């Protein structure tokens, strides 16, 4: 009996760690939803960073140059219309953190803005013409887009969004509700997932809110094995809570190790030559390579980053985005956030050339650097 109990304790611990690593993206979306809805209800509340992003906004991987705008979309039993502005990079991800649609420069509207129709799970009604149609498997969605400054001015992008962006049920197209645009620059808020035991609480929130058909049955089975099951309360007893607390601690240090010290060549742009790593090992926004999920790549991405779209992995010059990251310097020493780091001296090292608007990586001596080629 004692041996069997130890075996089951170990089994529950293993499943807790794997549930953490395989579901961190779900918790991330739960954190995003909570942080955004603190400012107002879904569908009518739009967060605008009119004065750009700052340290009071706890987000994953934002920059302080783009003009971020975001809202939480909650579907019901009918399609929802989203009227989008031009000249933005916009994405819609579902509650499981799966890609639904692009809009703007990388979308079907080709940067001109347009009307998108988001079809909820199980909808059997007619779908009218005149919309960019996207089918989804969840009710909750994260909608985010970013505009660009014009000669250092954020107003053109902000004002265009306020004038054009609308969200409403299809049945209300003749009388759409008013949108509430909130400037959240300088306002403290947190959209980041938990890293401790409470990450399981966040995962449970999404499992309870969404149809099971939208998620992988294998993953749902893993979550059910630790007590997270749709239609049932997540109430682990003292023994199980202790095990899951330890599992979360191990999961947290594991994803940090995956991010800071990737051990597979596929994580690096130039294995053995450079520390610059790709956010999408395997080259897929779905984290799939040769038919198999890149499990470590998915976990490490969703630990530190946010936003899923094929535009981040496709080489869409002038439209999409390409990213590189590094946790160490060229000598493999960890970057220390408590220290002041010197900017890359491109004049001395000759690593920056001005050409055609692409962000690429350059190999060479002295250390590998980032080369910006742009007008």
Mark where each language-model region is.
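A compositional/structural signature for long, glycine/proline-rich flexible linkers
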Residues: 1-330
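Carbohydrate-interacting regions of secretory-pathway proteins
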Residues: 327-375
């Amino acid at each position: 009996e004692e041996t069997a109990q130890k075996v089951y304790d170990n089994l529950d611990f293993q499943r807790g760690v794997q549930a953490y690593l395989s579901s961190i993206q779900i918790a991330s979306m739960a954190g995003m939803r909570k942080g955004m809805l603190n400012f107002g209800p879904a569908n009518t509340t739009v967060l605008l960073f009119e004065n750009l992003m700052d340290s009071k906004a706890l987000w994953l991987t934002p920059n302080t140059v783009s003009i971020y705008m975001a809202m939480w979309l909650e579907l019901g039993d009918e399609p929802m219309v989203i009227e989008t502005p031009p000249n933005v990079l916009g994405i819609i991800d579902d509650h499981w953190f799966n890609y639904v649609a692009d809009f703007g420069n990388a979308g079907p509207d080709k940067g001109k803005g347009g009307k998108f129709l988001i079809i909820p799970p199980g909808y059997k009604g007619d779908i009218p013409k005149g919309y960019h149609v996207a089918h989804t498997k969840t009710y909750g969605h994260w909608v985010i887009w970013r505009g660009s400054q014009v000669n250092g001015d954020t107003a053109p992008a902000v004002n265009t969004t306020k004038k054009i962006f609308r969200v409403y049920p299809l049945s209300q197209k003749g009388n759409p509700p008013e949108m509430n645009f909130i400037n959240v620059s300088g306002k403290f808020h947190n959209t980041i997932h938990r890293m401790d035991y409470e990450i399981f609480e966040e995962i449970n929130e999404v499992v309870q809110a969404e149809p099971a058909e939208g998620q992988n049955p294998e993953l749902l089975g893993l979550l059910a094995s630790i007590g997270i099951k749709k239609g049932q309360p997540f109430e682990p007893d003292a023994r199980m809570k202790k095990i899951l607390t330890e599992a979360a601690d191990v999961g947290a240090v594991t994803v940090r190790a995956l991010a800071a010290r990737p051990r597979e060549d596929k994580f690096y742009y130039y294995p053995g030559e450079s520390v610059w790593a790709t956010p999408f090992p395997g080259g897929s926004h779905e984290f799939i390579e040769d038919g198999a999920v890149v499990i470590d790549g998915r976990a490490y991405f969703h630990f530190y980053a946010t936003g899923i779209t094929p535009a981040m992995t496709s080489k869409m010059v002038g439209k999409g985005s390409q990213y590189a990251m590094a946790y160490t310097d060229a000598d493999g020493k960890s970057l220390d956030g408590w220290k002041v780091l010197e900017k890359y001296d491109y004049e001395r090292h000759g690593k920056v050339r001005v050409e055609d608007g692409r962000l690429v990586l350059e190999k060479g001596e002295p250390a590998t650097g980032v080369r910006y080629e742009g007008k």
